[in-house]
């Protein structure tokens, strides 16, 4: 084995020379230089500084403007809540541990950090799935006369939390476990060992199939059908001007959604899958650290893509920030008209 396994950790460094120490008790400076740990801390500080205000602003603006409290926006707000979970439950902890060079909060703290980070990420992922299904049902109309209402939105929210907990909670109760990963300053699911005592292999397979591949398939399917439907409507010259404009907006949103999702999560999932399927292979701590920390940028991408591109929300946000005035001069009528014009195909 090219790593060192302990009772509740796996360090990707051979202990042939006897230098490996528990990541819960000693700085891990034999894995990387101290300045590299400082860089991780600076990176986490940047994510906190950017991620907290933009996600908090999303919630605040929605509370201030009643017209934003629509069923579809409930799902979008769920993304902001998920990102705040990641910021407070994961990023702040990782910032502190990176400054110390090891996971100073012990196994219990590792469980909590891993749980909140996983929970936030999964809430966001399943929120995107619900959003994709809603767009598919509204635009493609597989069910005639369907209207996405408040009850559907609430059911969608409950679904995202159930699925997120179904992924994040099992390691806390004995099915798999959370351990420090990479440079040992943040915690995640144990992809490194089979650990039969906690049935780790079955959980990782379950997690990849149910909580990664299936959501990815649903997102691709729904938005693929959505683009096809819009193109077909445009080709038939149905409401030509409106449809042509909607086609551009939907295509742009689909491309950004898919690319952002893949950029954020495929590197992490790919490395995790490689580590899991190549038990005992030789890899360094940076190999998992970079994709794990890069995936955390989703807390910034989500509000920018799914909230900031909403014309009505953007107008309300500017009005809130400018103490009730909109220096851009977008009046209520034009905003409402724009929303109505593309309500069937563009983000609400």
Swiss-Prot record:
Q: Name one Pfam family in it.
A: Rhodopsin_N
Query: Where are the N-acetylmethionine residues found in this chain?
Result: 1
Q: Which GO terms describe its biological process?
A: absorption of visible light; G protein-coupled opsin signaling pathway; G protein-coupled receptor signaling pathway; visual perception
Positions where N6-(retinylidene)lysine occurs in the chain: 296
Name the residues that bind Zn(2+): 201, 279
Q: List the glycosylation sites.
A: 2, 15
- According to the record, the segments passing through the membrane are 37-61, 74-96, 111-133, 153-173, 203-224, 253-274, 287-308
Q: Which residues carry this modification: Phosphoserine?
A: 334, 338, 343
Record SUPFAM superfamilies: Family A G protein-coupled receptor-like (SSF81321)
Annotated lipid attachment (S-palmitoyl cysteine) = 322-323
Q: Which GO terms describe its molecular function?
A: 11-cis retinal binding; G protein-coupled photoreceptor activity; metal ion binding
- List, alphabetically, the InterPro entries matched: GPCR_opsins, GPCR_Rhodpsn, GPCR_Rhodpsn_7TM, Opsin, Retinal_BS, Rhodopsin, Rhodopsin_N
Tell me if DNA-binding is a UniProt keyword of this record: no
Membrane-topology annotation of the record: Multi-pass membrane protein
Q: How is it modified after translation?
A: Phosphorylated on some or all of the serine and threonine residues present in the C-terminal region.
Where in the sequence is Phosphothreonine found?
A: 335-336, 340, 342
Q: Does the keyword Disulfide bond apply?
A: yes
- The ranges of region (Interaction with SAG) come to 330-348
Give the family per the record.
Belongs to the G-protein coupled receptor 1 family. Opsin subfamily.
Q: What is this protein called?
A: Rhodopsin
Organism per entry: Otolemur crassicaudatus (Brown greater galago)
């Amino acid at each position: 084995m090219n790593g060192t396994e302990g009772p509740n950790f796996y360090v990707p460094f051979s202990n042939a020379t006897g230098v490996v120490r528990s990541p819960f008790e000693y700085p891990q400076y034999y894995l990387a230089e101290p300045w590299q740990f400082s860089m991780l801390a600076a990176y986490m500080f940047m994510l906190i500084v950017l991620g907290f205000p933009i996600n908090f602003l999303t919630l605040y603006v929605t509370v201030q403007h009643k017209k934003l409290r629509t069923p579809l926006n409930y799902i979008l707000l769920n993304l902001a809540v998920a990102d705040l979970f990641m910021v407070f439950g994961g990023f702040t902890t990782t910032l502190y541990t990176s400054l110390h060079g090891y996971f100073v909060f012990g196994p219990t703290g590792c469980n909590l950090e891993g749980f909140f980070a996983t929970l936030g990420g999964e809430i966001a992922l399943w929120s995107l799935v619900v959003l994709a299904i809603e767009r598919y049902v509204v635009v493609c109309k597989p069910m005639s006369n369907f209207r996405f209402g408040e009850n559907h939105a609430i059911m969608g929210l409950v679904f995202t939390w159930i699925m997120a907990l179904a992924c994040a909670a099992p390691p806390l109760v004995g099915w798999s476990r959370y351990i420090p990963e990479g440079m040992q300053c943040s915690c995640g699911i144990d992809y490194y060992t089979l650990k039969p005592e906690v049935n780790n292999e079955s959980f990782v397979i379950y997690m990849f199939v149910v909580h990664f591949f299936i959501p990815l398939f649903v997102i691709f399917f729904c938005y693929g059908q959505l683009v096809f439907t819009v193109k077909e409507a445009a080709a038939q010259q149905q409401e030509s001007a409106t449809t042509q404009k909607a086609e551009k907006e939907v295509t742009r949103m689909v491309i950004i959604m898919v690319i952002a999702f893949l950029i954020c999560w495929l590197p992490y999932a790919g490395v995790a899958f490689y580590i899991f399927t190549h038990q005992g292979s030789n890899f360094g701590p940076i190999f998992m650290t970079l994709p794990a920390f890069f995936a955390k940028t989703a807390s910034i991408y989500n509000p920018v893509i799914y909230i900031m591109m909403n014309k009505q929300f953007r107008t309300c946000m500017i009005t809130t920030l400018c103490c009730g005035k909109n220096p851009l001069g977008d009046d209520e009528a034009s905003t409402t008209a724009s929303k109505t014009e593309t309500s069937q195909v563009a983000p609400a």
